[in-house]
């Protein structure tokens, strides 16, 4: 893991402002192997510049065979992956996916505790933390296994993202209004999304990767 740490971009557990993505095809090309469009990113767009650094660091950490597999994905898949990543503002150069998933579990449990104790603030805060969970070192793809880096396989991420992150935001909004009944009703949808994603992508040894340098 020390080599992974040394090769990633500087700074650990960095927190960035949410990114407004207006040219998804440009960003996808930037992330997934085309240097031609790098110059189209405006220099004064600090959010875009930070995202560029993060994504270049993720690509650099991938072993060559994974880099080639990722570059071969369709534009639609690349744009989907970028749209998911752009929803997050916490990127780590230390945490593995296993560690991130433990954080997600803790946030889920905090949501349940908040609902059971009728604490709208605890519930909403935990739900928003879950929705904006940390992205692990190297990004998400290295932990999914080479066999899953295909257009068909990755297409299901959209539904899982809506089930987990999307419903977590809805749960937070319901808690903000004091509507704990609606908040509670969303727990099942969130957990179903988690279980479904695990069924598709979780490897034999969860949360680790042999596809990082």
Enumerate the language-model features and the residues they cover:
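N-terminal secretory signal peptides that target proteins for export/translocation
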Residues: 1-19
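Cleavable N-terminal export/targeting peptides
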Residues: 2-3, 26, 39
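Bacterial N-terminal signal peptides
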Residues: 24-35
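Sec/Tat signal peptide C-region and signal peptidase I cleavage site
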Residues: 36-43
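Sequence context surrounding c-type heme c attachment/ligation sites in exported
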Residues: 44-213
């Amino acid at each position: 893991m020390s080599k992974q740490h040394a090769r990633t971009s500087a700074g650990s557990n960095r927190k960035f402002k949410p990114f407004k993505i207006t040219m998804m095809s440009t960003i996808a090309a930037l992330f997934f192997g085309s240097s031609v469009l790098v110059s189209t990113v405006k220099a004064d767009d600090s959010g875009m510049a930070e995202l560029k650094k993060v994504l270049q660091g993720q690509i650099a950490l991938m072993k060559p065979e994974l880099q080639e597999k990722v570059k071969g994905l369709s534009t639609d898949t690349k744009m989907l992956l970028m749209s998911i990543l752009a929803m997050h503002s916490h990127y780590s150069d230390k945490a593995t996916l296993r560690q991130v998933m433990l954080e997600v579990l803790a946030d889920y449990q905090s949501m349940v505790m908040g609902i059971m104790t009728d604490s709208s603030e605890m519930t909403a805060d935990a739900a928003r933390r879950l929705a904006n969970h940390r992205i692990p070192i190297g990004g998400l793809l290295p932990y999914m296994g080479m066999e899953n880096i295909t257009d068909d396989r990755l297409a299901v991420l959209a539904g899982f993202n809506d089930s987990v992150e999307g419903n977590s935001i809805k749960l937070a909004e319901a808690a903000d209004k004091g509507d704990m009944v609606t908040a509670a009703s969303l727990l099942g949808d969130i957990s179903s999304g988690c279980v479904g994603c695990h069924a598709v992508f979780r490897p034999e040894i969860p949360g680790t990767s042999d596809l990082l340098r």
